[in-house]
């Protein structure tokens, strides 16, 4: 995320400049701040694995996901990228969106260009 933010905020970066000009960007640097503060990799303070809460988030179990989903529903989403990290892997990786009912082959082709 740090690298993406550097590119997006650097006035001298041509890629960042074009993205700022052509796109409305919504970035969530950390979907699980309370869990991260407690040293949790996947679960929030309520003990919910946020990776498994996207289909039916609730205010009680996954308020973080609910807030993000509500914003996505409100503003619409043309493209999303879910970047993950793992202490056992020295690099970040993309998590896929397979299984989403509205996911199309065309979206998949565009998405997997970034792997």
Which role does the model predict for each range below?
Residues 1-115:
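Active-site/substrate-binding loop(s) of hydrolase catalytic cores
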């Amino acid at each position: 995320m740090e690298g993406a933010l550097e590119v997006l905020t650097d006035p001298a970066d041509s890629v960042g400049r074009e993205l700022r000009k052509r796109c409305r960007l919504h970035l969530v640097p950390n979907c699980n701040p309370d869990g991260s503060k407690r040293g949790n990799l996947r679960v929030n303070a309520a003990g919910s694995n946020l990776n498994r809460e996207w289909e039916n988030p609730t205010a009680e179990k996954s308020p973080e996901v609910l807030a993000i989903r509500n914003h996505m529903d409100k503003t619409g989403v043309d493209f999303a990228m879910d970047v993950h990290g793992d202490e056992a892997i020295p690099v970040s990786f993309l998590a896929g969106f397979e299984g989403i009912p509205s996911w199309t082959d065309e979206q998949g082709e565009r998405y997997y260009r970034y792997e």
